[in-house]
UniProtKB/Swiss-Prot annotation:
Organism ancestry: Bacteria, Pseudomonadati, Pseudomonadota, Alphaproteobacteria, Hyphomicrobiales
Protein name: Small ribosomal subunit protein uS12
Residue(s) carrying 3-methylthioaspartic acid: D89
Organism for this UniProt entry: Rhodopseudomonas palustris (strain ATCC BAA-98 / CGA009)
Gene symbol of the encoding locus: rpsL
Record's subunit section: Part of the 30S ribosomal subunit. Contacts proteins S8 and S17. May interact with IF1 in the 30S initiation complex.
Keywords attached to this entry: Methylation, Ribonucleoprotein, Ribosomal protein, RNA-binding, rRNA-binding, tRNA-binding
Amino acid sequence: MPTINQLIANPRVVQKSRKKVPALQQSPQKRGVCTRVYTTTPKKPNSALRKVAKVRLTNGFEVIGYIPGEGHNLQEHSVVMIRGGRVKDLPGVRYHILRGVLDTQGVKNRKQRRSKYGAKRPK
């Protein structure tokens, strides 16, 4: 416990809380260019090949974004939109790539939760 004199000499400093999505810089989304599209494996106890992309954002940040849904058309130099939201079983993946926006196509044959995957309404 500090004395009054110690507190006068150097007052208490409020700790700043760590941001969960620093690369967005308070924006809801950011645009970027894919520098590498690849698959990676999740933490234990899960097993899969998760599709991810390394993205260079317009503000200079380089982040890893998860590509949701079945199948995708992304490759190097694809222009994508990114949103916040981590993937719990992929360490270091703190962003999601938006489907159906810019160069990313929506998921084919998607009937439910279509808006989340950029799928058009079936006829």
